[in-house]
C-alpha cells in the first residue's frame, strides 16, 4: 500500500509501513504509520485509515524526534503468541501521540527501522563521537579471516599463506561460546538441530523491554527476574497436567502399522506428548549426519497415532543420527510453552559417529521448567561402566542456550522436572538366557530385577542418582525376533533385558502407568510408555503484580542508597603442566558483601570478542547474588584440537587476564598463568617427520623452528633441513613415528576386533596413549584396541593441515568420478602427506579383508576417514553440502577399493 501525498509534494521513497490504532483517550482511530525518505530527509507520515487516505501529519526525523515503546504493566508472566505493543511518538513541535500496533513482531521491526533511520540522519549532521572511557565493551562476534593451508606443492600453489598454523576447522563464536568440555568437544551442527516446526511462541514485548527509558533495563530486568524466582511461592498455584512419555528402539525399520496402540491407549488425551526413538536409521550415511528419510516417516506416523479427541501441535523435533525426540502439546496449551531450546551430544567414537549419545529439549510450561532427554547408551552386557560414563558425559556436556535471553547456559539438572527416556541398554547380570526366560514365564519378575544393572548402578550411586523409576510390572522389552513376540532365536541368543526405560526427577510428579506395548512388532524392541500427572506452577496475575510492584519499590529505594560490591577469595591462578585433552580446574568464591542484589559477568577485553581464550572457561560466567550470598566459580582449562596447534608452536601460552564486571560497580581482574607441555597431537606432519625423538624431548625453540619452516623450502633441498641433533643432517622419516606406532599396533592386534572404529575408547586409556606418544617411543601401546583406534582418529583430526592439504580439496571433489585423475591428485601432495595417505590406505585395505570379524564396512571406513583426511578449508566448512561430502567419500573409495599397487 503506497501512501497518497498532497498535490505538489515532492516524490518520496516509502521504506516501511505498519497499521495500527491511534489512542485518543477512550477512542481508537485506525491509522497507518509510514517511514519515508524525501531528498535525503527521513520522515514519519501518520495517515488516517478512512475511506480516503490522506496525509494527516508529517513529522521530520531529527535529533528532537522520539519514537519509543511503552512498557506494559503486566510483566514477565504468561507469554502470548503475539500480544501487540504500544508506542509513543513526538516530533519537534508536535504533541506526544500514542499508538497501539496489534502485530508485535511488525511493531518491533518498524521501531528498529525508525531507530536506524534516526541514527543515519544524526550521522549526516554530527560526526560520530567515540567514547574512549569505555575501556571494556561487549563486542559482536566477527568472522575471523580464513587462513589458507600451511603446506603447498609445486608451482600451482605459490600464493599460499604459510604463516598461520591455527587449526581453525571449528572456530569458536560469540562471547557465550562454551569451550569444548571434556572428554569430547563434539557439538551437533546447526543443521542437525533444525526444528521442523518453526512457529514458536513469541517472547512478549514486555520481556524484551521491561523498562524502556532505563539505559540499564537489561540488568534491572535480570535482577527482577532473579528476585521474582526467589519469591515464586507467593504468586503461583499448582495445577496438574497429564504427560505421556514414550520410548522405542525401532532397529532402523520403517513404520509398518498404526502407533495408536502405543500413543492412544488412555481414555483421556494427555496434555503433552514426549516421544523418543532410537536406531531410527542404521545406514552409514545417517551415522555421519546425512539427512534421513526415516525422520519424516516416523514423525508422520506419530502424528497419525495421536488421539483424535484432541487437537495437537508439534512443539519441536530434534534428532542426532538415530535418536529423535518429538514433543507435542494440545493446541490450547501451546501458548503457555516458551523458551524452547534443543541440544544433542554424541558419545560415539570421537563424536563423529553419533550412534550413541543423547538428544534433549528444554522448555518452560507456564512457570515450570522441563528438560526431556532421550538417550541411547553403550551396548553389550559387560559395558555397564561405559553406560555410566555415557550418562555422565551427556550430563556434563549438554547445556542449553535459551533463545532471546542473555542468561547463562543451563544444564540438564537445572530444571524443575527432568524426564529421561530411551534405550539405556542396561542388561541383566545373568548369563543363562534359558534361566531368565523360565523366570519370566513364572512371572517372577522381582527376582530378575535384583540382577538388573540399572538398579544396581543406581543403588551404588554410579548413575542416575536422584532419579526415580516406577515399578516394573511388564516383561523385558529386548530382544525379540522382528515382527514376532518370540525371544531372540539368532545364534547370539541374547539374554532378555529391560533396556528401554523411563526415569524422572523433580517434585509434584506422580506416575500413573508404566507399561510396554506388545502389540507393536516392527522392531526387536517393544515400545514403552509412562503416563504422569505433573503439578505445574501457574501464575496468578493479581498476586504476581503485587509481588512485582513490591520488588520494584524495594529496588528503587535500595539502588538510590547503595552500590553493589563483591569480595573475591582469589585473584591469581596457576595451571601447571597443562596437557592436550586433560582438564584442569581451579575454584574460587565470590561473595556479595554489599547491601543490594548484584549481577556479575565476565566480559571481553578491548578488541576481544570473547571473555577468555579458547582453552579457558569460567563456570558460571555470569549470575546474580543477593546480599551475603556466596557462589563457587570454576575456572576450567582444557586444550582441544582447536587450540592445541598454537600452543604447540608457541604462538599462544597459558596466560590470560579475565575481567569480572559488576553492574553499577567496579571491575575485578583475575590473572591466569601456567605452562603447557607440547604434544605430537596438533603438530604438523612435516615437523613430526623431522623429529626422531619424542616431542617432549625437543627444545621449545627447536619446535618453533620446525613449525615455521615452509614446505616449499624443505622440498628444494632435503639435506638443508634444520637437524634435530647437532652436527647431523638426516633425511626425515617417511611417516611420523606416532602414526606408525598406532597403525602398527592396530595391524598386529586389532584386525579381528569386533566393531573396530565404531566403539569409543576409554578416556583414561586415551590419555595414557597421548602421554606415551609424547614422552617415549614405546614397544607397545597401552590401552584397548578401541582406545588405540580412537587415538589414531584424534591424531588425524587434530592435524593443523589434513593429510590431503586444503589446497587440493576442491580438486579431489572434482576428480572423484575418475580414478586416474584421483591418483594424479594424490601424487601432487607434499612427500610426507603423500606417504601418510598411502600408508593409511594400505592399512585400511588390509583391515577390510577381515570385515566378517570386525564388522568394518567399506562405506563406513570411507565415510569416517573422509571427514578426517579430506576436510574442507575452514572458510568452506560451513558451506559444505551433502553432495560435497558424497563426492569426498567417493574420492576415498577409489583408493579403498583399488589394488595394493595403487
UniProtKB/Swiss-Prot annotation:
Keywords: Cell projection, Cilium, Cilium biogenesis/degradation, Coated pit, Cytoplasmic vesicle, Endosome, Golgi apparatus, Hydrolase, Lipid metabolism, Membrane. GO terms for molecular function: GTPase activator activity; inositol phosphate phosphatase activity; inositol-1,3,4,5-tetrakisphosphate 5-phosphatase activity; inositol-1,4,5-trisphosphate 5-phosphatase activity; phosphatidylinositol-3,4,5-trisphosphate 5-phosphatase activity; phosphatidylinositol-4,5-bisphosphate 5-phosphatase activity; small GTPase binding. It catalyses: a 1,2-diacyl-sn-glycero-3-phospho-(1D-myo-inositol-4,5-bisphosphate) + H2O = a 1,2-diacyl-sn-glycero-3-phospho-(1D-myo-inositol 4-phosphate) + phosphate; a 1,2-diacyl-sn-glycero-3-phospho-(1D-myo-inositol-3,4,5-trisphosphate) + H2O = a 1,2-diacyl-sn-glycero-3-phospho-(1D-myo-inositol-3,4-bisphosphate) + phosphate; 1D-myo-inositol 1,3,4,5-tetrakisphosphate + H2O = 1D-myo-inositol 1,3,4-trisphosphate + phosphate; 1D-myo-inositol 1,4,5-trisphosphate + H2O = 1D-myo-inositol 1,4-bisphosphate + phosphate. Pfam families: Exo_endo_phos2, OCRL-like_ASH, OCRL_clath_bd, RhoGAP. It is found in: Cytoplasmic vesicle, Phagosome membrane; Early endosome membrane; Membrane, Clathrin-coated pit; Cell projection, Cilium, Photoreceptor outer segment. One of its GO terms (biological process) is cilium assembly. Detected in brain oligodendrocytes (at protein level). Detected in brain oligodendrocytes. Residues 238-564 are annotated as: 5-phosphatase. PROSITE patterns: RHOGAP. The keyword Phosphoprotein does not apply. A motif (Clathrin box 2) lies at residues 703-707. Its main location: membrane. GO terms for cellular component: clathrin-coated pit; clathrin-coated vesicle; cytoplasm; early endosome; early endosome membrane; membrane; neuron projection; nucleus. The record marks 758 as: Arginine finger. The ASH (ASPM-SPD2-Hydin) and RhoGAP (Rho GTPase activating) domains form a single folding module. The ASH domain has an immunoglobulin-like fold, the Rho-GAP domain lacks the catalytic arginine and is catalytically inactive. The ASH-RhoGAP module regulates the majority of the protein-protein interactions currently described. The ASH domain mediates association with membrane-targeting Rab GTPases. The Rho-GAP domain interacts with the endocytic adapter APPL1, which is then displaced by PHETA1 and PHETA2 as endosomes mature. Interacts with APPL1, PHETA1/SES1 and PHETA2/SES2; APPL1-binding and PHETA1-binding are mutually exclusive. Interacts with clathrin heavy chain. Interacts with several Rab GTPases (in their GTP-bound forms), at least RAB1B, RAB5A, RAB6A, RAB8A, RAB31 and RAB35; these interactions may play a dual role in targeting OCRL to the specific membranes and stimulating the phosphatase activity. Interaction with RAB8A modulates OCRL recruitment to cilia. Interacts with INPP5F. PANTHER family: INOSITOL 5-PHOSPHATASE (PTHR11200), INOSITOL POLYPHOSPHATE 5-PHOSPHATASE OCRL (PTHR11200:SF176). This is Inositol polyphosphate 5-phosphatase OCRL. The lineage of its organism: Eukaryota, Metazoa, Chordata, Craniata, Vertebrata. The gene is Ocrl.
Amino acid at each position: 500500500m503506497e501512501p497518497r501525498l498532497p498535490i505538489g509534494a515532492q516524490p518520496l521513497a516509502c521504506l516501511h509501513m505498519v497499521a495500527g490504532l491511534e489512542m485518543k483517550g477512550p477512542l481508537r482511530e485506525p491509522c497507518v504509520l509510514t517511514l519515508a525518505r524525501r531528498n535525503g530527509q527521513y520522515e514519519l507520515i501518520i495517515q488516517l485509515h478512512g475511506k480516503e487516505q490522506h496525509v494527516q501529519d508529517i513529522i521530520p526525523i531529527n535529533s528532537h524526534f522520539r519514537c519509543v515503546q511503552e512498557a506494559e504493566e503486566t510483566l514477565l508472566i504468561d507469554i502470548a503468541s503475539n500480544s501487540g505493543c504500544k508506542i509513543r511518538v513526538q516530533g519537534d513541535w508536535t504533541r506526544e501521540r500514542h499508538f497501539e500496533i496489534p502485530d508485535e513482531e511488525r511493531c518491533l521491526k518498524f521501531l528498529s527501522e525508525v531507530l536506524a533511520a534516526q541514527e543515519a540522519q544524526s550521522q549526516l549532521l554530527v560526526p560520530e563521537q567515540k567514547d574512549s572511557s569505555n575501556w571494556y565493551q561487549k563486542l559482536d562476534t566477527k568472522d575471523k579471516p580464513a587462513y589458507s593451508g600451511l603446506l603447498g606443492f609445486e608451482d600451482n600453489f605459490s600464493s599460499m599463506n604459510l604463516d598461520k598454523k591455527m587449526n581453525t576447522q571449528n572456530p569458536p563464536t560469540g562471547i557465550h561460546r562454551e569451550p569444548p568440555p571434556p572428554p569430547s568437544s563434539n557439538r551437533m551442527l546447526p543443521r542437525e538441530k533444525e526444528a521442523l516446526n518453526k512457529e514458536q511462541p513469541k517472547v512478549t514485548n514486555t520481556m524484551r523491554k521491561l523498562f524502556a527509558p532505563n539505559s540499564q533495563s537489561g540488568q534491572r530486568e535480570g535482577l527482577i527476574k532473579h528476585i521474582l524466582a526467589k519469591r515464586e511461592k507467593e504468586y503461583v498455584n499448582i495445577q496438574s497436567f497429564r504427560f505421556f512419555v514414550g520410548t522405542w528402539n525401532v532397529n532402523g525399520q520403517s513404520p509398518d502399522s498404526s502407533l495408536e496402540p502405543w500413543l492412544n491407549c488412555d481414555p483421556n488425551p494427555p496434555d503433552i506428548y514426549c516421544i523418543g526413538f532410537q536406531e531410527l536409521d542404521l545406514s552409514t550415511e545417517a551415522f555421519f549426519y546425512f539427512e534421513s528419510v526415516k525422520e519424516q516417516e516416523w514423525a508422520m506416523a506419530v502424528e497419525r497415532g495421536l488421539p483424535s479427541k484432541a487437537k495437537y501441535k508439534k512443539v519441536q523435533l530434534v534428532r542426532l543420527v538415530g535418536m529423535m525426540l518429538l514433543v507435542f502439546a494440545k493446541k490450547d496449551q501451546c501458548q503457555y510453552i516458551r523458551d524452547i531450546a534443543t541440544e544433542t551430544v554424541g558419545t560415539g567414537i570421537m563424536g563423529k559417529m553419533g550412534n550413541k549419545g543423547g538428544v534433549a529439549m528444554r522448555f518452560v510450561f507456564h512457570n515450570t521448567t522441563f528438560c526431556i532427554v532421550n538417550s541411547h547408551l553403550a551396548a553389550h552386557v559387560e559395558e555397564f561402566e561405559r553406560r555410566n560414563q555415557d550418562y555422565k558425559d551427556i550430563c556434563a556436556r549438554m547445556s542449553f542456550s535459551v533463545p532471546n535471553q542473555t542468561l547463562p547456559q543451563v544444564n540438564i539438572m537445572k530444571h524443575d522436572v527432568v524426564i529421561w527416556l530411551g534405550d539405556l541398554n542396561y542388561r541383566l547380570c545373568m548369563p543363562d538366557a534359558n534361566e531368565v526366560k523360565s523366570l519370566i514365564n513364572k512371572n517372577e519378575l522381582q527376582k530378575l530385577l535384583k540382577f538388573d544393572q540399572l538398579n544396581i548402578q543406581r543403588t551404588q550411586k554410579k548413575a542416575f542418582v536422584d532419579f526415580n523409576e516406577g515399578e516394573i510390572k511388564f516383561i523385558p522389552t529386548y530382544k525379540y525376533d522382528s515382527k514376532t513376540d518370540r525371544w531372540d532365536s539368532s545364534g547370539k541368543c541374547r539374554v532378555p533385558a529391560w533396556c528401554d526405560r523411563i526415569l524422572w526427577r523433580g517434585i509434584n510428579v506422580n506416575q500413573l502407568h508404566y507399561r510396554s506395548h506388545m502389540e507393536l512388532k516392527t522392531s526387536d524392541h517393544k515400545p514403552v510408555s509412562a503416563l504422569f500427572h505433573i503439578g505445574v506452577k501457574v501464575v496468578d496475575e493479581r498476586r504476581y503484580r503485587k509481588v512485582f510492584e513490591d520488588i520494584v519499590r524495594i529496588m528503587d529505594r535500595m539502588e538510590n542508597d547503595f552500590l553493589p560490591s563483591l569480595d573475591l577469595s582469589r585473584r591469581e591462578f596457576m595451571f601447571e603442566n597443562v596437557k592436550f585433552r586433560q582438564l584442569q580446574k581451579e575454584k574460587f568464591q565470590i561473595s556479595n558483601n554489599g547491601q543490594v542484589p548484584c549481577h556479575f559477568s565476565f566480559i571481553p577485553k578491548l578488541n576481544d570478542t570473547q571473555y577468555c581464550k579458547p582453552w579457558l572457561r569460567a563456570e558460571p560466567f555470569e549470575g546474580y547474588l543477593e546480599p551475603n550470598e556466596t557462589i563457587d566459580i570454576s575456572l576450567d582449562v582444557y586444550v582441544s584440537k582447536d587450540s592445541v596447534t598454537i600452543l604447540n608452536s608457541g604462538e599462544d601460552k597459558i596466560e590470560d587476564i579475565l575481567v569480572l564486571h559488576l553492574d553499577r560497580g567496579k571491575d575485578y581482574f583475575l590473572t591466569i598463568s601456567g605452562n603447557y607441555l607440547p604434544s605430537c597431537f596438533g603438530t604438523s606432519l612435516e615437523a613430526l617427520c623431522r623429529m626422531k625423538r619424542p616431542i617432549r624431548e625437543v627444545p621449545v625453540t627447536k619446535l618453533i623452528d620446525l613449525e615455521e619452516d615452509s614446505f616449499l623450502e624443505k622440498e628444494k633441498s632435503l639435506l638443508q633441513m634444520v637437524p634435530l641433533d647437532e652436527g647431523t643432517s638426516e633425511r626425515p622419516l617417511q611417516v611420523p613415528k606416532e602414526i606408525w606406532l598406532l597403525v602398527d599396533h592396530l595391524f598386529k592386534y586389532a584386525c579381528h576386533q569386533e566393531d573396530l572404529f565404531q566403539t569409543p575408547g576409554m578416556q583414561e586409556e586415551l590419555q595414557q596413549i597421548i602421554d606415551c606418544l609424547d614422552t617415549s617411543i614405546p614397544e607397545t601401546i597401552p590401552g584397548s584396541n578401541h582406545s588405540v583406534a580412537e587415538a589414531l582418529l584424534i591424531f588425524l583430526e587434530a592435524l593443523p593441515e589434513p593429510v590431503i592439504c586444503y589446497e587440493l580439496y576442491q580438486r579431489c571433489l572434482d576428480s572423484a568420478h575418475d580414478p586416474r585423475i584421483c591418483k594424479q591428485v594424490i601424487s601432487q601432495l607434499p612427500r610426507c602427506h603423500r606417504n601418510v595417505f598411502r600408508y593409511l590406505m594400505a592399512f585400511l585395505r588390509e583391515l577390510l579383508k577381515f570385515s566378517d570379524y570386525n564388522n568394518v564396512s567399506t562405506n563406513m571406513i570411507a565415510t569416517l576417514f573422509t571427514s578426517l583426511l579430506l576436510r574442507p578449508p575452514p572458510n568452506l566448512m560451513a558451506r559444505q553440502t551433502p553432495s560435497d561430502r558424497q563426492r569426498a567419500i567417493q574420492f576415498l573409495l577409489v583408493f579403498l577399493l583399488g589394488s595394493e599397487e595403487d
